[in-house]
Amino acid sequence: MKRILALVLSVLMVLCLFAGCGKDEEKSPDAPDVNGDGLNKNEVVNGPINPLTGEKVSEDNSDLRPYCVMINNHPDARPSVGLSQASIIYEALAEGGITRMMAVFNDVDGITVGSLRSARPYYISMAQAYDAIYIHAGGSEQAYSDIKTLGIDNMDGVRGARSGEASSYYRDQTRLSQGKNVEHTLFADGSKLASFCKNNYELKHDSSYDNTYG
């Protein structure tokens, strides 16, 4: 009798096991779609897109050159200003174990950016890849040599001598009053940067330039 009962129980357990495996688990309506089943993987974005990020935008500006701005990332220079408006931000070691950033903007008109720092050759190479206008405050001698040799369109807040160039930069008086070192206090008025570039440089890409997206 015990053997028969054990056999019956074993059969019932096997049947329950198969029944559980054969039934799809019901998804909670609030559960996240971890498999991405709700995504339209074949969706095509119609209309203009940000040439730097691929995101959909209201106005097509893919023919406009971006601005690459050198940003101070020393702890004493924080918080930085304007980074939230950038499409791309590069960060790399400069010297002394401190990193420096280069923010890539579709447009700088109407924003404040800073604090600003000097040019470095590897950042110049990055900016050149975007056919960008390079915004900096000073630079190493090699950086100045590369800017001249490569013909980089740039604005310099230290040696810039053209009308409207150096005046686009200013020292933040609040930071100075807080006792911050002067190299952590230089900012730029984006509207003045844009105005200077409009008067001195071609703002549109050459027809041969190939955008990242498009």
List each language-model region with its residue ranges.
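C-terminal motif of bacterial Sec signal peptides marking the signal peptidase cleavage site
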Residues: C16-G20
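Bacterial signal peptide processing site
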Residues: G22-D24
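Catalytic/regulatory signature loops of cyclic-dinucleotide turnover enzymes
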Residues: K27
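Positively charged n-region of N-terminal signal peptides that target proteins for export
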Residues: M1-V8
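Alpha-helical transmembrane segments
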Residues: V8-L15
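A surface/extracellular/periplasmic glyco- and lipid-processing/surface-interacting theme
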Residues: A31-P32, G36-A86, E95-G214
